Design a protein with these regions (language model features):
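Coiled-coil dimerization/phosphotransfer module
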Residues: 1-126
Length: 126
């Protein structure tokens, strides 16, 4: 979690994106396998990279919380967005989807042209 916060701060500040970071404090009390930690970090990193490369956003909200028996990661921006119906996923999004599948998680991408993008990962906890 600390690495994710540091990466977010560095990435957002370097690219002059205003951001809000909402991470639950209870992450110290949950157990996630090392492999799933790695997947989670790399999904987060790829989502930030995509935001910087394609979104042209000014603001972002990055949150990670525990709800019931699920870890929910959400990355939301106010960028240019895209039409998800006519979008052909590149390697980055395909890799994120593959990692989510390996975690037995669900990755949702919601985007509207001119209104930004929200990426949400729902990961079941043991």
């Amino acid at each position: 979690v600390l690495r994710m916060k540091e990466l977010a701060a560095e990435t957002m500040e370097l690219n002059k994106i205003n951001y809000q970071l909402n991470f639950d404090q209870q992450f110290n009390n949950i157990s996630i396998t090392m492999q799933n930690r790695r997947h989670l970090f790399l999904i987060f990193k790829e989502a930030l990279n995509n935001m910087v490369k394609y979104a042209s956003c000014k603001n972002a909200v990055l949150s990670m919380q525990i709800k019931g028996h699920n870890l929910i990661l959400e990355i939301k921006d106010d960028g240019v967005g895209f039409d998800t119906k006519n979008f052909i996923a590149g390697n980055g999004l395909a890799n994120m989807q593959q990692r989510a599948t390996e975690m037995k998680a669900t990755l949702l991408v919601h985007s509207t042209p001119g209104k930004g993008t929200t990426i949400t990962l729902h990961c079941p906890l043991k």
